[in-house]
């Protein structure tokens, strides 16, 4: 059955890295007999330029009917003071598709260990996933600003916590069978509920070990290798996922996914649109290419295709083929061609 993939190239280097990702997908699809159609739609700044809105109606309708969505990058300085900004499109599509779970793998590539700000012995064996709840918590509560005081309401329901916990435990079942739930249970009421629900969900997954960890002693920098799957609420997840992105020493090799309960998932690099290098052909496409691998595995259960891509990226880096952000001289096209060759 042919799968429908909606692509949102967006802004800056987005079109360049999207082309790289689709080039790799085309090659690997022929190897694993994966049939798909691509429906390219404007989004972000490109949506504003084309339709006056970062999430045009036709783009949203296509996304809702897709089997998966690939997003490259959005934003740029031309929109900094605009009344409508590209980032509003990302918030809107998350809401419209009910993307409640953000998944961010953190892995250290052997060929890039020297880029990490941590000592080699600290990053040895680092391979974990941060699972962040996206639709609840303090970001979506009431925000009240008065003249000399302010308050932000942090709300979570047991159902919101339960579904993100189940997602984390299911991911752990396919990995190291360990979940670390991060909260602030010694202070926050929401964290007390978070921990209670986590304990309840853990009973559904007897093959997975659950540990609780307070957010202020998570030790993600001092002992990152201890983690397998980390699950946490929106605010803590925002901070910890960004903190974890420091470990590899570059944003250029980190993919991510955002999942709904029943609809399509969205896959994207964690880096920005890099408008300063857009159009120069020097952008690093690896995050986008690894996002394609995540899509194959998580939306289509095409584990073989995902592993082919990941192994090809590993091999390419080990051959010393590096883009400028990684300390080399390879262009976007050269890096992409090398990865395709190594498939």
How should each PLM-predicted stretch be described?
Residues 1-4, 34, 64-68, 98-99, ...:
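Short coil/turn connectors at secondary-structure junctions
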Residues 33-57:
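N-terminal beta-loop-helix "entrance" segment that forms/cooperates
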